[in-house]
UniProtKB/Swiss-Prot annotation:
Gene: fwdF
Binding site for [4Fe-4S] cluster: 33, 36, 39, 43, 73, 76, 79, 83, 117, 120, 123, 127, 156, 159, 162, 166, 196, 199, 202, 206, 244, 247, 250, 254, 276, 279, 282, 286, 313, 316, 319, 323
NCBIfam families in the record: FMH_DH_FwdF (NF042909)
Domain 4Fe-4S ferredoxin-type, chain residue ranges per copy: 24-53, 64-93, 108-137, 147-176, 187-216, 235-264, 267-296, 304-333
PROSITE patterns: 4FE4S_FER_1 (PS00198), 4FE4S_FER_2 (PS51379)
Protein's name according to its UniProt entry: Polyferredoxin protein FwdF
UniProt cofactor note: Binds 8 [4Fe-4S] clusters.
Keywords: 4Fe-4S, Iron, Iron-sulfur, Metal-binding, Repeat
Family matches, as InterPro entries: 4Fe4S_Fe-S-bd, 4Fe4S_Fe_S_CS, MvhB-like, Polyferredoxin, Polyferredoxin-like_ET
CDD domains linked: MtMvhB_like
One term of GO molecular function: metal ion binding
Names of the cofactor(s): [4Fe-4S] cluster
């Protein structure tokens, strides 16, 4: 029997068997692993053991999320085929089974329709994995805003009202610590013309008519169709598909419906609120930020200890594995296959993930 060797690295490990006909390598990447335990559920020889996920997620201990017994593992590749986050991969003679038509593959995907995208950056702000970057290039400011602003310092009494009301934070006051020889708390006023949008708010609020604003091209002063404002704004939304967990936060929040997400499973997450002890392990481990402690509107309102937004859940099961009181159940009703299993043994193995 050919010996299987396990090499451990800082962010994972590789188990490999080097035979005369073929070389098999099973690689695990800790950075991509979310601790869902799907690999352990599907393993036909029970070679995979999950770590203390709740404690790991909450930062109580530092340990691997899983381990594989190299002497038990048969390098069949079921775990790699079922892993929805590509944390496991089996290579046969250097080729990944994810690229091999003979092996099943779970599908998850995300698409950005750049022609719809308005480059608002909201998707980037909400992504729990930091997998989205909006590359936005603005035209030179002078193409949008042209004008002049003048402050008559003989009329100005340095009251600061203009600075308080300026929506662009373009007016700066120079403050002074009052002394008997120099008692004025404000000694000067300046306009940052790189920030000023010539909206005339300062002119309107000045009680001494000390400010004059001349606007040649000012979007804030009149209604301009959105397309006009965007004429000179270019860019694109970039998704790091290795980091993306297809939670759907981006599509959920997108005001332009420019993002489409395909999740690996359909079903629902069921929480036994009576069993839940509100430890927070599920919240800490969830790669999708789909769980939260609800906040009551007032002291009298009763709320569940924990709630889930089903729209943001990928049904990976990491929360269920981390829960110390077994208060969470994953009910999967459908697997989104890119390639369905053909062999009977593989079909039966994938059935373990259902229900």
């Amino acid at each position: 029997m050919i010996e299987q060797i396990k090499e451990v690295y800082e962010n994972g490990f590789t188990i490999y068997r080097d035979g005369e006909v073929e070389k098999r390598e099973l690689c695990w990447n800790d950075e991509l692993c979310v601790g869902c335990g799907i690999c352990a559920d599907i393993c036909p020889v029970n070679a995979i053991a999950m770590g203390p996920l709740g404690a790991i997620a909450k930062g109580d201990i530092i340990a691997p999320k899983l381990d594989i017994d190299k002497d038990v593992c048969v390098l069949c590749g079921m775990c790699a085929s079922a892993c929805p986050f590509d944390a496991l991969d089996l290579k046969i003679n250097g080729k990944s089974i994810k690229e091999d038509e003979r092996y099943p593959k779970i599908k998850r995907d995300i698409k950005v329709y750049q022609d719809k995208c308005v480059l608002c950056e909201q998707c980037e702000m909400v992504c729990p994995q930091g997998a989205i970057v909006v590359e936005r290039e603005l035209a030179e400011r002078e193409k949008f805003v042209i004008g002049e602003i003048n402050i008559n310092k003989e009329k100005c009494v340095l009251c600061g009202i203009c600075a308080e009301y300026c929506p662009a934070d373009a007016i700066n006051l120079k403050y002074n610590y009052p002394t008997p020889s120099n008692p004025k708390p404000i000694t000067d006023i300046e306009v940052d013309k790189d920030k000023c949008v010539f909206c005339k708010v300062c002119e309107f609020v000045c009680p001494h008519d000390a400010i004059e604003v001349i606007c040649y091209k000012c979007p804030m002063m009149k209604r301009i169709p959105q397309a006009k404002l965007y004429e000179d704004i270019t860019g694109k939304t970039v998704i790091d598909k290795d980091a993306c967990v297809t939670c759907g936060w981006c599509a959920f929040i997108c005001p332009a419906e420019a993002i489409e997400v395909e999740k690996p499973f359909k079903g629902e997450l069921i929480i036994d609120v009576n069993a839940c002890n509100a430890c927070g392990a599920c919240i800490s481990i969830c790669p999708c930020s789909a769980l939260e402690f609800p906040k009551p509107k007032d002291k009298a309102e009763k709320v569940p200890r924990i709630i889930v937004n089903q729209n943001l859940c990928v049904l990976c099961g990491a929360c269920a594995k981390a829960c110390p009181v077994n208060a969470i159940k994953v009910k999967r009703t459908e697997i989104n296959f890119e390639r369905e299993p053909k062999a009977i043994a593989w079909k039966e193995a994938f059935k373990k993930l259902m229900g």
